[in-house]
């Protein structure tokens, strides 16, 4: 967890996802956006995932980032329980992450999951997208996003 006010929840299905999903936290740290990082599974701990998703908005969170591989149901399960934007990060698995990509992107109408690239690049872009969403209502965050974008172009 970061020291800033928590605005983003970063969730992952298992401990093995941590090396990839920490990339999202690194970007949010750079942008000075507070986050909470948790491990919970749509399959193994569904009540915990449901409780987290259901209470996130009430805790002041603005965006949830979910990373999962294989069946990759975490982002969809969370999106079905929160009014917040959910960003799905498909993680690499036996089928090079294509199974997770398809599971993350194929959601029914009314339960959107914004889906980014597979793996570490996707985790970074999920954080950048979360920052852009938060920046629409926070000029200071928006300026840090602009500054980061411009620095990357140099």
How would you describe each model-predicted region?
Residues 6-44:
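Glycine-rich phosphate/diphosphate-binding loop of Rossmann-like nucleotide-binding domains
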Residues 52-90:
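Glycine-rich phosphate-binding loop
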Residues 12-19, 96-154:
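C-terminal binding/interaction regions
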Residues 37-59:
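N-terminal beta-loop-helix "entrance" segment that forms/cooperates
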Residues 17-21, 46-49, 68-77, 96-98, ...:
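Short glycine/serine/threonine-rich phosphate/pyrophosphate-binding segments
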Residues 15, 40-42, 69-70, 91-94, ...:
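Short, ordered loop/turn segments at secondary-structure junctions
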Residues 1-5:
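Basic/polar N-terminal segments that are highly enriched at the extreme N-terminus
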Residues 7, 33-36, 83-84, 106-116:
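Glycine/charged-rich beta-loop-alpha catalytic/anionic-binding loops adjacent to active sites
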């Amino acid at each position: 967890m970061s020291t800033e006010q928590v605005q983003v929840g970063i969730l992952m299905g298992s401990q093995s996802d941590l090396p990839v999903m920490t990339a999202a936290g690194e970007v949010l740290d750079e942008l000075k956006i507070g986050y909470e990082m948790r491990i919970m599974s749509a399959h193994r701990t569904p009540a915990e995932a449901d409780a987290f998703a259901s209470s996130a908005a009430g805790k002041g969170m603005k965006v949830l980032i979910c990373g999962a591989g294989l069946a990759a149901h975490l982002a969809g399960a969370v999106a079905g329980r929160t009014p917040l934007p959910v960003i799905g990060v498909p993680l690499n698995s036996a089928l090079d992450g294509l199974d997770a990509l398809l599971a993350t992107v194929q959601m029914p109408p009314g339960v959107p999951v914004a889906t980014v690239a597979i793996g570490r690049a996707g985790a970074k872009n999920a954080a950048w997208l979360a920052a852009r969403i938060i920046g629409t209502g926070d000029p200071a965050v928006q300026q840090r996003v602009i500054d980061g974008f411009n620095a990357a172009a140099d």
